[in-house]
Amino acid sequence: MTALNDTERAVRNWTAGRPHRPAPMRPPRSEETASERPSRYYPTWLPSRSFIAAVIAIGGMQLLATMDSTVAIVALPKIQNELSLSDAGRSWVITAYVLTFGGLMLLGGRLGDTIGRKRTFIVGVALFTISSVLCAVAWDEATLVIARLSQGVGSAIASPTGLALVATTFPKGPARNAATAVFAAMTAIGSVMGLVVGGALTEVSWRWAFLVNVPIGLVMIYLARTALRETNKERMKLDATGAILATLACTAAVFAFSIGPEKGWMSGITIGSGLVALAAAVAFVIVERTAENPVVPFHLFRDRNRLVTFSAILLAGGVMFSLTVCIGLYVQDILGYSALRAGVGFIPFVIAMGIGLGVSSQLVSRFSPRVLTIGGGYLLFGAMLYGSFFMHRGVPYFPNLVMPIVVGGIGIGMAVVPLTLSAIAGVGFDQIGPVSAIALMLQSLGGPLVLAVIQAVITSRTLYLGGTTGPVKFMNDVQLAALDHAYTYGLLWVAGAAIIVGGMALFIGYTPQQVAHAQEVKEAIDAGEL
């Protein structure tokens, strides 16, 4: 013990006699992005754990946002039966989410620029998660619709902010390309999962279709807090008034169309809702003309080609949404499919739409956008015409049902690509982001607006044929037959809307070269090369 102490004492005396050398100064550690942080003992051929965590956090929100726009479709009949919803209330379970999601999307993106994208993203995910709990415990129509409205607000805050976080979290090159690809893939995966997983969970209880969001949301919040970094804040005046007025105008219009068939088109509540929609729309135009940072810059609408393109995008989004909802309700209400079978039966539609998107992406540089859009519109028209004549109670899945949804899916996919690229054709580099966001907003808002009209047609036709509204479990054979004919009659209106989209495309004057250039610029931006 003494020898040990003497040794220690000798070492200390030797080190004390040496000249003192200050420790070298380490450069301050800069804040690193998720893909730049080294992982000691982690295989170099695999993405880093930080990269994976960031991708899961950002891509997960896009997955949930897409899932919840489709999951309610297969759950609607059971929700209507358990909560005794009217047909108007049933439609609101879907449209409430899409209205606030689409209407507040642009505001959500700018909110991230103003107060920080990481903070905004976490707030949006938290609101979405809490709203999912409220959806699951809803005890009547009002609470469920309010919870769905809140869910849409959460998605509108988190989803566009998540896309912006891809650019600030991952450096240019393979890391950002991979993250962008994952983010884009979540849309397609979410569409399928919303139908299949939603259908499977609905077989147990429709409430589980919303509760499944809760653990995923909590994991995303944790990963976002640990794997994402905060961005610089910009001083920007938010056009909250414009975004709220636009959402209010669309909501009031949808409400008027949804209650018109049951309450009467000349009833006080229907006319009042229409007047509110008109007043909100006029106020929106006035506000946008004077706003410092308008949600919708009106100078983008001075180009006739772009104005027609935006109108076609609005209607095409409505056609796609209405087709999905109408077929989803038809196979359960009339054909008696279970929720799971209905969800699985829709997978060919998603695959067909992907095929249409791929084919159109290859042809868009060779043919003018009007040719591809008209071709897609006529494919959809033929599919809906076929469905209106050959779909009836007791028909087999193949070919009577699978034929129209596959052909219709290809048609929609063919029309979407040229319309989306036409929206950004000829605009400046700094305007591509805002114009793309406006196109996405119009596509989202087109869904509830067109569905409200189609649902009003179906309800009016049902009542005209001696049927009734409400849960199908209370209907007799005569009333079910009336509802059957009303659904197929509604498909004729969807077919008519597809023809109108094709007619609008006749007035789109962009050339294949302009659209091909827009496609190249967009791909370069998505890849982080510009």
UniProtKB/Swiss-Prot annotation:
Membrane topology: Multi-pass membrane protein
SUPFAM superfamilies: MFS general substrate transporter (SSF103473)
Keywords of this entry: Cell membrane, Membrane, Transmembrane, Transmembrane helix, Transport
PANTHER family in the record: BLR6921 PROTEIN (PTHR42718:SF46), MAJOR FACILITATOR SUPERFAMILY MULTIDRUG TRANSPORTER MFSC (PTHR42718)
Subcellular location: Cell membrane
Similarity comment: Belongs to the major facilitator superfamily.
GO molecular function: transmembrane transporter activity
Tagged with keyword Transport: yes
Residue numbers on the Extracellular membrane side: 72-91, 141-150, 202-203, 261-266, 328-343, 392-400, 459-488
Name this protein carries in UniProt: Uncharacterized MFS-type transporter EfpA
Chain ranges passing through the membrane: 51-71, 92-112, 120-140, 151-171, 181-201, 204-224, 240-260, 267-287, 307-327, 344-364, 371-391, 401-421, 438-458, 489-509
Basic and acidic residues bias spans: 1-11, 28-38
Taxonomic superkingdom: Bacteria
Region (Disordered): 1-38
Gene Ontology cellular component terms for the protein in this record: membrane; plasma membrane
Stimuli inducing this protein: Expressed during infection of macrophages. Down-regulated by the nucleoid-associated protein Lsr2.
Sequence ranges on the Cytoplasmic membrane side: 1-50, 113-119, 172-180, 225-239, 288-306, 365-370, 422-437, 510-530
Keyword Transmembrane: yes
